[in-house]
Amino acid sequence: LKCHKLVPPFWKTCPEGKNLCYKMYMVATPMIPVKRGCIDVCPKNSALVKYMCCNTNKCN
């Protein structure tokens, strides 16, 4: 699986066991990602922070 880093088009190959790409952003500024990368389990959203997770190449 290949996931984008914070600034596309840069990406990295995920290590074994991290089978999701994710994008974390603040609810107040959804167009500005705070973090991107590979993750094993999609974190829960909170009142301030949301996560978008997906399992295809470079989908974050």
From Swiss-Prot:
Gene Ontology MF annotations: toxin activity
InterPro entries: Cytotoxin_Cobra, Snake_3FTx, Snake_toxin-like_sf, Snake_toxin_con_site, Toxin_cobra-type
Disulfide-bonded cysteines: 3-21, 14-38, 42-53, 54-59
A biological process term (GO) from this entry: killing of cells of another organism
CC per GO annotation: extracellular region; membrane; other organism cell membrane
Subunit structure: Monomer in solution; Homodimer and oligomer in the presence of negatively charged lipids forming a pore with a size ranging between 20 and 30 Angstroms.
Name of the protein in its database record: Cytotoxin 5
UniProt organism field: Naja annulifera (Banded Egyptian cobra)
